[in-house]
Amino acid sequence: MSSVAVIDYGMGNLHSIAKALQHADANAAVTVTSDPDVILASDRVVFPGVGAMRDCMAHLAERRLEQVVRRAAAEKPFLGICLGMQALLEESEENGGTRCLGLITGRVLRFPEGLTGAAGEPLKIPHMGWNRVHFSDPSHPLWAGIPAESWFYFVHSYYAAPADPADVAATSDYPTPFAAAVARGKVFAVQFHPEKSQAAGLRLLANFLRWEPWSSR
């Protein structure tokens, strides 16, 4: 039985993610926790989050979880979701500049005002709703069994901009391309919400629960 720690640092609907993980694999032992010992003893770690980056980093610091997250990402299969993906980069331009965890080189940027769609219609910020995802590396194990150009559910005003294109595992468009997923080593992270993305999201979570990055990549 695989043990999965969902990191609780005071931000995000963690129980919906835990429920989706349990639905993806009924045999997984899923725990929502802020206990460093439990996190580091788990087989897999999920790092979710919604809200402001400044609050995210402050909450991690208050709970002394910054180094725990870094260590978990280096040692075991690690899934970042939404703000949890953005926090892996070096800096966010939110709130005039906020230092992030620095596990992936690059910055987090805000969608500019005045965006328009293909027909000239104004696009709202935040980017909210279903959008198509283009796999940069369709062979990655977390995309297994998910059709190309699948739709996933997004809610965000900021997006990750990795410096190295090799770190980008998927893109989406609003209206220009942005990183919808990143991958490096044992880390895979997504901007969308798999727990809200129906069959494709549940399949991604199931793939994560089976992923063995030490043997597959």
Swiss-Prot record:
Of the GO CC terms on this record, one is: cytoplasm
Q: Which reaction does it catalyse?
A: 5-[(5-phospho-1-deoxy-D-ribulos-1-ylimino)methylamino]-1-(5-phospho-beta-D-ribosyl)imidazole-4-carboxamide + L-glutamine = D-erythro-1-(imidazol-4-yl)glycerol 3-phosphate + 5-amino-1-(5-phospho-beta-D-ribosyl)imidazole-4-carboxamide + L-glutamate + H(+); L-glutamine + H2O = L-glutamate + NH4(+)
- Write down the CDD domains for this protein, in alphabetical order: GATase1_IGP_Synthase (cd01748)
Entry's Gene Ontology BP terms: L-histidine biosynthetic process
The metabolic or biological pathway listed in the UniProt record of this protein is: Amino-acid biosynthesis; L-histidine biosynthesis; L-histidine from 5-phospho-alpha-D-ribose 1-diphosphate: step 5/9
Q: Which UniProt keywords apply?
A: Amino-acid biosynthesis, Cytoplasm, Glutamine amidotransferase, Histidine biosynthesis, Hydrolase, Lyase
Q: What is its EC number?
A: 4.3.2.10, 3.5.1.2
Q: Which GO terms describe its molecular function?
A: glutaminase activity; imidazoleglycerol-phosphate synthase activity; lyase activity
Q: Indicate the segments forming the Glutamine amidotransferase type-1 domain, all copies.
A: 3-217
Which NCBIfam families does this one have? IMP_synth_hisH
Q: What is this protein called?
A: Imidazole glycerol phosphate synthase subunit HisH
Organism of this sequence: Methylococcus capsulatus (strain ATCC 33009 / NCIMB 11132 / Bath)
Give the lineage.
Answer: Bacteria, Pseudomonadati, Pseudomonadota, Gammaproteobacteria, Methylococcales
